[in-house]
Amino acid sequence: MEPSKFHSTVLARPPGMYDEDDDHRRRQRDILNPPAPSQTGPGSGGSSSAGGPRPPFSLRSPTQSEFHHQSSQHHYSASSAASGPQSTYNGANNGVPQSHSHSRSNSHSRHSSSSVLHSPYQQASTASRPAHALDLHRSPQTSGLQAPQRSPGLHAPSVYYSQESREHHPPPPKPIDKPASSGRSFYDPLTDTTTTSTSDRERRTSDAGSSWHNATTNAVSTPTHRDAYNSYSKPAANPSPYYGNGKYTSPSASIYPPRSPASHPQSVATAAAEPISPPTRPPRMATPNILNPTTTSSMAAMSQAESPAQKAAVPAATPSRAAELMSFSNILSSSEPAPKPRPRSPVLAETPNKQPEPEPEREPTKEPSKEPSKEPSKEPSKEPSPPPADMDETSDSPACPEKPAEVDAETEPDAEIHDDVDTVDGLEESEKPEPPIKREKSAKVEKAPRRPRVVEKEKKERVTKAPRKSAGAKGRASEVKAESTPKQSRRSSGKQEALSSSRVPAKRQANGLTKQKAQALEQEKAVVAEMEQLEEEALDESEARAELRAFKKRKLNRQKALETTDLSVATELLPSLKDEAINRHHRRHDFSAEMVLKLGVHVALGRLRFGDHNYDAALKEVREQELFAEKERKKDMQRKRRREKSMAVTIEQKEAALAKAHATEDKLERQKLLREAERANKKAQQTKLILQKGIKGPARNIMPMDVNLEGGSMATFSADSMEPGKGKGKGRAGNRPKKSKEQKQAEKEAAEAAQAALDAGQELPSKEENPKIRIKVNKGKLSKDKDRDVDVDTIDGDNTEIKDTEEPPPKKKGKVVEEVKDTLETRFQSKGYNQIYDQIWRDMARKDVSKVYRLATDSYYTKASNLKKTAILAAKEAKRWQLRTNKGMKDLQARGKRVMRDMMTFWKRNEREERDLRKAAERQELENARKEEADREAARQKRKLNFLISQTELYSHFIGKKIKTDEVERSTDRPEVAAEEQKNKPAGENALTVKEPTGPVGAKVTNFENLDFDAEDDETLQAAAMANAQNAIAEAQRKARNFNNDDEPDEDGEMNFQNPTGLGDVEIEQPKLLTATLKEYQLKGLNWLVNLYEQGINGILADEMGLGKTIQSISVMAYLAEHHDIWGPFLVVAPASTLHNWEQEIKRFVPDLKIVPYWGSASDRKILRKFWDRKHSTYKRDAQFHVAITSYQMVVSDVAYFQKMKWQYMILDEAQAIKSSQSSRWKCLLSFHCRNRLLLTGTPIQNNMQELWALLHFIMPSLFDSHEEFSDWFSKDIESHAQSNSKLNEDQLKRLHMILKPFMLRRVKKHVQKELGDKIELDVYCDLTYRQRAYYANLRNQISIMDLIEKATLGDDNDSGTLMNLVMQFRKVCNHPDLFERADTSSPLALVRFAETGSFAREGNDVTVGYTTRSVVEYILPRLLWRDGGRLTKAGSDNPSAGFRSRYLGEMMNIWSSTNIRESVDGTDNFSFLRFADTSIAEAEKVGKTDLFARASELAQRRNRLANMHVSYDDDEEDNFTPAHALFLIRQRQDRTALSEITSEGALQNLMNVSHVMYEDANLPRMDQAARPGASAPPIEVVCHTSSTQIERDRVLFNVPMRKALFGPNLDEQKEFVLQKVPVEQLPPAPLLPKPDNERQRFTSITVPSMRQFITNSGKLAKLDELLFKLKAGGHRVLLYFQMTRMIDLMEEYLTYRNWKYCRLDGSTKFEDRRDTVHDFQTNPSIFVFLLSTRAGGLGINLTSADTVIFYDSDWNPTIDSQAMDRAHRLGQTRQVTVYRLITRGTIEERIRKRAMQKEEVQRVVITGGAGASSGVDFSGRRAPENRNRDIAMWLADDDQAELIERRERELLESGELDKVAKKRGGGKRKKVAKDMGDGGGVSLDEMYHEGEGNFDDNKLSGAATPNVPDSTDAKPGKKKKATGKKAKTTKQRLAIADGQMDM
């Protein structure tokens, strides 16, 4: 088949503009890189290289106009790496036949359907079609592959241009010898613009440098088959390396899918777009190695099938032609940055004339070009690499047959595969090598000069490398390496191509005209630099995998979309094509899968070949590195030996200097020697340090620091490297030259020889006469610089003569020849000229000559003086060597002294070392003895502690057998829960194996000194512990029996409290005195309490809050009264907020008990004490009182009176109030005479274990006494796990539970209460607003991490206050920024004067301030004008004429009088118009006599009667009807009121007033104004300082009728009008003033803060607002807890704005108001929100009517929040309780909440036990009170800072710094602080944290109910303290003053 007649089977070829001959010529030229004439003979077989067939992709220049962009689809360059989606399109859609219309066939109808999917391979069927090969080389004009030629910039699609321009074809190529343009434009893929370049060298690159699908230079190029709309390629098994051809490439394709025919209906859109944008990376299914192919023998066969003329027409190397404007190669070569030449790699050299044997035909697979030169050559070429053959200017001539092409050396080494596909199909995956690594760029050849030709000498110098044969499949690949074609770098070839070839100007517009230069060179260089940067960037492997996965996912999606699109398009175009489209899709899919497998094989072969090529070079490089490392090691050893020798010498010098210093008696000499010894010692230490640690890094390669020429001392350079400066002496200029070591040694030897000669009595040898140095000095003036230019070194050392370079030339003596004068000079030879000339010379001789002579003389004397000084100095310098000869004797003496000093130093050092060793041995013995003693003491203390714990365990064991607390705890109302928990517990978990005593009870051990814990064995200690436990039990029972010794025992022998031992197993029923019904768990709790009472043992009832601890305590009192006739006295001590609750509960449940509410003033309490009967220890039913209820504060204040009473039972509610054993409360209550004590608490552990120890010590002081060991075990040992953040020892926890069991009973709600609803806790996270973030960041920036760490570790109490202050500021920011600064009401600048008063006391209760503002500008009128006749109309004594005018002119002669009007109304008189104006005479007279405002008011009230009349007579016949009395009132008669005014209701009103309705609906009248005036002022007034003036002014301003007329009646008046049923006729008229535009602001400019902005300024408040709306809609009632009273104030404003009812209870609420407030909330369902402070509302009150609890800010102590939420979740609550906790995300609140959760977990584990002990508990949230700084600092610090604090604390602990600080502070201070903490005088962490809430304890109760009596144990009871002067107030008092709870 003819090449020109071959067409696609689907699409017709578009017509071209050239004839068939021209097409044939262009096809011949299009055959890329044909073989040289000498190699294209029959024997060559069409092969271009000696070693292999011609590749389908070649190294042809991209500057050729017919360069096919299909072949450049794998054109991989730096520009294509960043080309974007267009590049992806160009590179991913090639080779699929088109089935769409011919209008889109210009770029896609290249081949038939048998072409390959954008793959360089074809199926086997294509090899047998020669016409196919011919069709591959059609010209772009005939194949339609290129769009109309335009400028190489980025253009719109071809559809954008007209049909004429699209059908226009490019002109024929320009001659090759045309000079290149100075500037050229290229497409910039980074900025999507066309960039102009002026440097042709930087812009033009070869096809080898810009494409990576090249083979040998003489190979024939076969363009790739295109099928544009096939599916995506599949990724290769081994992905391509990230750096192909030295450039960076992303491992994943672009995210843009290829264009489909369905999505792009334009006819030539894709055809125009393809050559514009450079192609992208190669297809993903093949590595870049495969995409650098060479052709197979089938391609060779294709080229052989062509005509001989075709072969002859193609030169050996394709010349560089002028690029077409829109050729893809032009764009691509222009867009690539300037290449950097690479070093050449060694290649195999062969004879160029050797012809390879033709290979058999095979599949036309495209194989990568051969690249054996991966590694750089051993000797990089110093000459620039020659250009390739196809770049040679003469390469198109047949006269160059010997010049072989050079293959690029920069592509991948596996770039050429000549193996058959069938040969390598069976290659194993394991044999495939890894992808190559990116090579280093070589920049050495970058600046080489350009060379136009290839140098043959350079080829001969190539290193010959023997091929390495591999077995099997590698045989063919290794044969390829025998190619004789020399290789060169692509980069270098690209540069040479740019040098050797010229190009036509590429700056052209769309019409073909030359485009003006518009871009700068800097822009192109910036793009090139950006591309190079992209090349050097590395891609992370994880990112590559992620991109690969994303690309695979997009590929599958795109495949599905394309399948659907193809089917839909085919079905729409022609239904019959549907099956064909489906078959085509299957064929493409199968073929692409097959090609993937084949390409994978070639990838493996390429990798193996790469290993073959680079193995020797790599081995050589490794050997060189090893050799270099060995050399460096030897050098290091030499340096080490030199340093050791130097150190030894330096040490000897140091010892010698020290010996001399000790021996000498001269103080200055000794100091000098000591300094020398110190320097030597320092030098030796430095050398020793270097020898030990070594110099880090290659110190030998580090250059010394830069020379400091600006002064200072540096030891890294010599002085002669500096510029000459000022000398040290006055007569010295510059520094003395530094002598070398040889010179110094020579001088020293000469001096020693001279000294020896003198000592021997010989004469000194004569000094050798050196040639004198003559310095010739010009007599003329020399500069100082030239004087200093004499080389001093030359003068000293070299015997050379220095001559002045500026010696004046000798004067020539001879006859003076008179010169010929100029004509201009002869012109001035006149008499006048000569006179002037002579005068000038005379003046110079008289004035200037003497001056010049003096200057010359001074200069001469100065020079002579300098020369004399120089000569003297030189003489001194010359004689200096003679002075040195006298130093020999001195050196000998000094040497002797030095030896003596060295000996003394040695013996002293020896003695000192012996003495130090002896002392060290003694210290070690003492230390060992101290350690042994410490170990013995620790063992003793451990045994003592074990003894104490065992004693307590035994006591608990004996009591527990009688009390059976464990059974009571396990028995619940929910047996299924208890059974499940019991099942989870191991058998005998807390069982204590105790051998019961059988003999008599042993003696109690009270003095621990009697026990020898070292000698005693365990059995003796166990027996002592058992004896102590039994004695403790007996003692408790004895005390219980002997409590009332005065009472006689019951004769009947009834079981009462005196004989209680028989009640251990008795089941107690509910007392009948109790009116309520106890629940099962409450009845069991009563049994437990009664058993404790019977045994005389105190206990702790620690049930969870809300389970009825109060009713159980009351039932105990009822039981004692009913069964044992013990009616008291009972003492109940409770917090002040629960006193009323206790009184109500006792009256309600046991009304027979008489109550004394012991609170109030001192006189009230005195009266109440009269009811106390101190004579009897037990009360009967008829006693005056049975129960006394008081508060903790009252107990402390009246401790003397309480101690006199004997209390049967003392109940302490909320017993955590006595958590400190050092507090006055604890001591006072412990001193009371009580038979039994009962502690009620829901949280036995709030902060630390010391609190639990205080409670246990309180209930059993005889057992839990103040032994330090036991206290330490409770607080320190257990809490040491908090410091180490470790797990709590399970054995210790078990022993702790065993101790607590008998004395403490605790049940939780989920076990005992079935009907109680669930409690759900939710954390609601809020974000900071912009204002809050700004505040928070400012506060954060003020914190210094170092200060924070220091205060956290070593801080004192003052630091605690500072840190807590920071915490408070952060909490304020999180709550609301208005806590810092409120948004105030604002107004314009008021330029007014306000009224002032001297004293409000004289003003009365009300002060009138109306119209008291005055303008700053006043119009002052004198009284003469205002009052004394100034106003002519004002009658007075000074103006008698005013009455005359008023009388005669205003009354008698007034024309508006009724008489005058009546006389003038007839006929044509003046007032005759009245009868036609509907006006009566009286109305006319009234108009003339009333003022303007009255007339306006009257007119506003008058109704238009004529308009209504006009409506009544509105007939066609009576159009002109007009009443006779209203002929002149034309406007009133025709005045029809608009419908919008008369329609005031109904739908018609909205329709007729659309604008008004829309204005109202848009809420515009109530919006805040966007702007306001800058200033305001009242109007200017006339001011006259008289009383009459003020009266007249007030008469106008306070004119009530005028105000009513202007503003109308107010709301109250309107309401009264309706209530009084005022007739409509009597209602006042509408106001004359219009309504204000803004209803909120009205007529004022004062701006009130917006509540909406108030809500949105806080993230918490905004979230709370949203939450409250939902709760209100759901019918819930809310308890809202705060920790700052100021925040409660803000919340009150918010609730008022929302119009929700609320009530408030906080620390400032009076004691008598608390009960009423709680009662109102419980009984009034309309109250939606109850505002409480966490501490005030968390104790004892019942708020079960609420079912929602919201914590606006959480507490750092979880027990406080638990108490607060249990106000609603307690007995009586029937609904589910939901607890919301607002937490600001990423702030201090999150860390406070985290610490609180840790603390809560600790409490759960310690009290309840369970799984927490084994799972590990984080105790890091708890610290001792003295370490509270750390707790606060942990809130402030983030995670990194917290780690630093802990690390610093560990360092201080290890170094003992903490102990030193503790000792420094002193133990007395700690005791005082502890006492203050207990008494309340100090500030605890709780009080500091809640400083914004006020006081909530009993220290301050408002009102007269409970006065404030200070807590103090120091003052004796009954005595008052003396009044002192002004005393500094505590922090607590200052807070109380700030909250208004305390007076100043």
Swiss-Prot record:
The subcellular localization recorded is: Nucleus
Q: Which residues form the DBINO domain?
A: 840-965
Task: Output one GO MF annotation.
Answer: ATP binding
Binding locations of ATP: D1103, E1104, M1105, G1106, L1107, G1108, K1109, T1110
Residue ranges, annotated region (Disordered): 1-518, 715-815, 966-1003, 1862-1944
Fetch the SUPFAM superfamilies from UniProt: P-loop containing nucleoside triphosphate hydrolases (SSF52540)
The residue stretches assigned to a coiled coil in this entry are 506-563, 624-696, 908-953
Which top EC class is named for this enzyme in its record? hydrolase
Catalyzed reactions per annotation = ATP + H2O = ADP + phosphate + H(+)
Q: Where does the Helicase ATP-binding domain start and stop, copy by copy?
A: 1090-1262
Q: Which Pfam families match?
A: DBINO, Helicase_C, SNF2-rel_dom
Q: Where is the composition biased (Basic residues)?
A: 101-111, 727-739, 1862-1873, 1918-1932
Q: What is its EC number?
A: 3.6.4.-
> According to its record, what are the GO cellular component terms?
Ino80 complex
Ranges of biased composition (kind: Polar residues): 84-98, 139-149, 208-223, 289-307, 327-336
- Reading the lineage from the top rank, the first entry is Eukaryota
| Residue ranges, compositional bias (Low complexity) | 73-83, 312-323
Major location, coarse class? nucleus
Which family does the UniProt entry place this protein in?
A: Belongs to the SNF2/RAD54 helicase family.
Name this polypeptide is given: Chromatin-remodeling ATPase INO80
Organism name: Pyricularia oryzae (strain 70-15 / ATCC MYA-4617 / FGSC 8958) (Rice blast fungus)
Primary gene name: INO80
